[in-house]
Amino acid sequence: MNEKKQSRLRRAKSTRLHIRALGATRLCVNRTPRHIYAQVISADGGKVLAQASTLDTSLRSGTTGNVEAATKVGALIAERAKAAGVTKVAFDRSGFKYHGRIKALADAAREGGLEF
């Protein structure tokens, strides 16, 4: 495994341990060059309460690997999380830098009503 990926996974592990200690519901984000995924996971880590990604039929028709798509996923995850009764989450960026698509998703989720 290359050094860049190892560093990302180390950061992700540290973040997840901190969130688990808080006992908070988390908004977990993962990205690939082509898609972006978001899940709201319960505080015990055992249940996915809401999910959204660029693979959803409503978002799949457009481009899927850019900031615009991440903004749409952020708005969709906020809507689905609120429908599941979740308004406050801890943001788990999975070790990715808070920049670009990750930042766009987080900003859209905040505008949609989620509290970080």
UniProtKB/Swiss-Prot annotation:
The keyword Ribosomal protein applies. Keywords: Ribonucleoprotein, Ribosomal protein, RNA-binding, rRNA-binding. Pfam families: Ribosomal_L18p. GO terms for molecular function: 5S rRNA binding; structural constituent of ribosome. GO terms for cellular component: cytosolic large ribosomal subunit. The keyword Ribonucleoprotein applies. SUPFAM superfamilies: Translational machinery components. Coiled coil: none annotated. GO terms for biological process: translation. Signal peptide: none annotated. NCBIfam families: L18_bact. This is one of the proteins that bind and probably mediate the attachment of the 5S RNA into the large ribosomal subunit, where it forms part of the central protuberance. Part of the 50S ribosomal subunit; part of the 5S rRNA/L5/L18/L25 subcomplex. Contacts the 5S and 23S rRNAs. Belongs to the universal ribosomal protein uL18 family. This is Large ribosomal subunit protein uL18. It comes from Acinetobacter baylyi (strain ATCC 33305 / BD413 / ADP1).
